[in-house]
Regions:
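Catalytic cores of peptidoglycan-degrading enzymes
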Residues: 1-89
Length: 89
């Protein structure tokens, strides 16, 4: 069973594609320097420039790129610096 991944908050997709390290990945800008990154998807179902709503499906968990097993690498960045996601949940 493929597990879906979802946008953590509303925003605009700025990257939806392939990276050698992140595999199939999605990057969403939420404004004010806040960005979320979702890595290692088996497939993605959004495209760059697309607006997404909080909770909208963006892809499926996978093990692409530098990965040893199926998982979602979720990262929050503020002005380009990784920050604790718990501060935004």
């Amino acid at each position: 069973v493929m597990k879906s991944t979802y946008a953590a908050a509303a925003g605009t997709v700025i990257t939806a594609g392939w990276s050698n390290s992140a595999g199939n990945w999605v990057v969403i800008s939420h404004g004010n320097g806040l960005v979320t990154k979702y890595m290692h998807h088996s497939s993605i179902c959004v495209s760059a420039g697309q607006r997404v709503a909080k909770g909208q499906q963006i892809g499926y968990v996978g093990s692409t790129g530098y990965s040893t097993g199926a998982h979602l690498h979720f990262q929050v960045e503020l002005n380009g610096t990784p920050v604790n996601p718990n501060n935004y949940m």
